[in-house]
Regions:
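Mg2+/Mn2+-dependent nuclease catalytic core
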Residues: 135-230
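Metal-dependent nuclease catalytic regions and adjoining charged, substrate-binding loops involved
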Residues: 189-288
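Hydrophobic (often cysteine-bearing) scaffold residues that line and stabilize catalytic clefts
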Residues: 61, 65, 69, 109, ...
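Conserved phosphate/pyrophosphate-binding and hydrolysis machinery centered on Walker-type P-loop NTPases
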Residues: 58-63, 103-110, 253
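Short beta-strand or tight-loop elements
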Residues: 30, 129-135, 146-150, 256
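C-terminal, charged and often intrinsically disordered regions of DNA end-processing helicases
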Residues: 1-62, 281-288
């Protein structure tokens, strides 16, 4: 609570710097928060700092699809007898008709994802019960605290493996797994919490059944953690400037490009709007 306002945010110009000799307070956030600042400081500001928060656009069809698949792959483990067919039926239970072009498009994609989840589970998704399902993990590195939720954590003969489900049309590659900052940070957090090495990370593309994987080393994980700390230092400086100057801060430029067409906050960003027309809610599923 802010001493200046009695509420959760301070009046611009009243932020207090740490006392001399005192360590910097922890900067806490998720991998998504770090990537938001890296990708577009303007979106980061609107999403995490501006209060009241700008209204976001309604959910897109591919998000509705992804949520249904993730929910089904989580809830299948709560069934008395988890089976591939039962997991597929859970897609129907979790489905929401939000963002689709019309009921027919929603129906087609629901059937596709029901079949995809069934096939994924039949191909080995039920081989062993995970150590964690949508498990929250966290670690602290100096003045950085990272916390996030992993889709699945496996113990494969003593090896801890971080698994992330993907449902987009693009099939991930091993290089995607290698370069993923979130996966590496989740692995570092698992290692810290379980006190056992967690070096393997995997992207499971549910629609195709493809698995992209990378085996980190302790050194490569350390480099990813340092990358996160570098982003955090820049974000911390921007946060402090926002606390002092509010909307007058110049440390949150809009990074314009193709992603502006998909941004949930583009209605509040003139630069993003000028980058090109907005994509329809169902555009990610359009070529079906």
């Amino acid at each position: 609570m802010s001493a200046a306002t009695g509420h959760g945010t301070a009046v611009p110009g009243t932020a207090q710097a740490p006392l001399p000799g005192m360590p910097e307070p922890l900067w806490a956030g998720s991998p998504s928060k770090l990537l938001a600042f890296l990708d577009c400081p303007r979106r980061y500001r609107m999403q995490y700092l501006d209060r009241p928060a700008p209204e976001r656009r309604r959910q897109r069809a591919h998000t509705s699809l992804g949520i249904a698949v993730h929910n089904a792959l989580r809830e299948v483990w709560d069934l008395p007898e988890p089976t591939p067919a039962a997991g597929g039926r859970l897609v129907d239970d979790a489905w929401v008709d939000v963002g689709f072009r019309d009921p027919e498009q929603s129906r087609r994609w629901r059937a596709r994802m029901r079949d995809a989840v069934t096939s994924y589970l039949r191909a080995g998704g039920l081989e062993r019960r995970p150590v964690g399902i949508e498990r929250t993990v966290a670690f602290v590195s100096d003045d950085l605290r990272v916390q996030g939720r992993i889709d699945r954590l496996d113990d494969r003969d003593g090896e801890l493996v971080v698994v992330d489900y993907k449902t987009s049309r693009q099939v991930p590659t091993d290089d995607d797994a290698r370069t993923s900052l979130p996966l590496a940070l989740y692995a570092a957090a698992v290692w810290k919490m379980f006190r056992r090495p967690a070096l393997r990370v995997e992207l499971h593309h549910v629609p195709s059944g493809a698995v992209a994987a990378h085996e980190h080393t302790p050194q490569s994980l350390a480099r990813k953690v340092e990358q996160a700390r570098s982003i955090m230092r820049d974000a911390r400086r921007a946060d402090a400037d926002h606390a002092e100057r509010g909307a007058a801060s110049t440390m949150f430029p809009a990074v314009t490009g193709p992603l502006c067409a998909w941004c949930d906050l583009r209605a509040h960003c003139p630069e993003g709007q000028s980058a090109g027309p907005e994509k329809p809610d169902w555009a990610a599923l359009e070529d079906d």
